[in-house]
Amino acid sequence: MQLFKERRVLTVSALTALVRGLLEENFEQVWVEGEISNLACPQSGHCYFTLKDAGAQIRCVMFRGAFRSLKFTPRDGMRILTRGRLTLFEPRGEYQLVADYLEPQGIGGLQMAFIQLKEKLAKEGLFSELHKIEIPKLPRRIGIVTSPTGAAIRDILTVLNRRFTNVELLISPVRVQGEGAAREIADAIDDLNRVGNIDVMIVGRGGGSLEDLWAFNEEVVARAIHRSKVPVISAVGHEIDFTIADFVADLRAATPSAAAELVVASKKELTAEVEALSHRLHVSQQRRLERSRALVTALSRAITDPSRVLGHLAQRVDSLDARLVREAGLILDDASERIVTLTARLSRQTPALTLKRWEERLATLSLRLDHAMTRRLACAAESVGLATGTLNAVSPLATLSRGYSITRKLPARSVVTSSRQLAPGDRVEVSFAAGSALCTVEQASRESDSLTAPPRSV
């Protein structure tokens, strides 16, 4: 009885609350590695998955705020390292891990996010050369998107001042790292597009770690560069650094200084090129002037001696006159010969000759037709005579004329060919060569029997 009195009875809810308190107090932050399975991310924005290894598994949840801060997209089968706290989900009595950080095993989370976004944008065609805009050779107005206090802007300005000072710069200051930097960069690109009269745009920053450069790996920056109507030069980090912005931009520069060198030509180089063009123009003008002088000299000679010009013209007139006479004679000869030929052909093809030939052909054909019809009628008459003789030979009328008769059994009028078809009392019709008679059968004998006339009564 004493033992029963000291028993402490707990409800399920109370026990669950105690266990939850113990878990949350002793496992406030733990690091767990395993493989993701049963990943589900509903519209609420929270993410649910199971973390497992060969011997066990644990349910995990990552709430919307923490999930949105991930730089990569978790997938089933991915091995990860996660940080979180243990708690108990009281409605089901299951303990679970509330994760606030995920990192892929074997590769950093940022690197994984870089690879995933690069593959996604490549499939959409954002890196295609078809979307690249040509960089102008002599821009008058250049837009720059970078930090106003970083080394990148100083390098760009130094190179531009050294190479070509006659260019207008429009600087859009932004943060180039940290939270919100990517959004600022994208907005600055859009703003410079709205300003108008911008010939080319440099977007970049100096070197740094992958985390420092990450703003230029964000999707929002990539899409802003892609939709820009102004050609964009990406100049992020050092030569070995590559960002998503580099792949989307119309041109990639290894450094901000290199971007400045690409966007404008050196003033010395332009001066040398102008001098070379001036020299070529001078040489061309000199040659043209020399040709004009030679032409003037030749014309001057002709003008100073008109008789020479008239002599040449008279000689050419004589030559053309002789040629005209010769060509006219040839043309007339050809025409005469053609007239003779056509006259001969016409005489052979007069309507009278043609009509005569057709009359002769008609007479010949008529004669042939008469002969053919005569032969055909003679053959037909002979065939009719033969058929008539044959028909008379087999005609029943011819047989009847020789004393024979045809007997038909009534009432069907079927021809009787044997005495077996008849019986005493049958009515028959006997046809002769002239007329017929109705008779009654009194006796029918077999072929070998002879008929006996019935006795007559006197």
Swiss-Prot record:
Pfam families: Exonuc_VII_L, tRNA_anti_2. One of its GO terms (cellular component) is exodeoxyribonuclease VII complex. The keyword Zinc-finger does not apply. One of its GO terms (molecular function) is exodeoxyribonuclease VII activity. It catalyses: Exonucleolytic cleavage in either 5'- to 3'- or 3'- to 5'-direction to yield nucleoside 5'-phosphates. Its main location: cytoplasm. Its EC number is 3.1.11.6. Keywords: Cytoplasm, Exonuclease, Hydrolase, Nuclease. It is found in: Cytoplasm. One of its GO terms (biological process) is DNA catabolic process. Heterooligomer composed of large and small subunits. PANTHER family: EXODEOXYRIBONUCLEASE 7 LARGE SUBUNIT. Bidirectionally degrades single-stranded DNA into large acid-insoluble oligonucleotides, which are then degraded further into small acid-soluble oligonucleotides. Belongs to the XseA family. This is Exodeoxyribonuclease 7 large subunit.
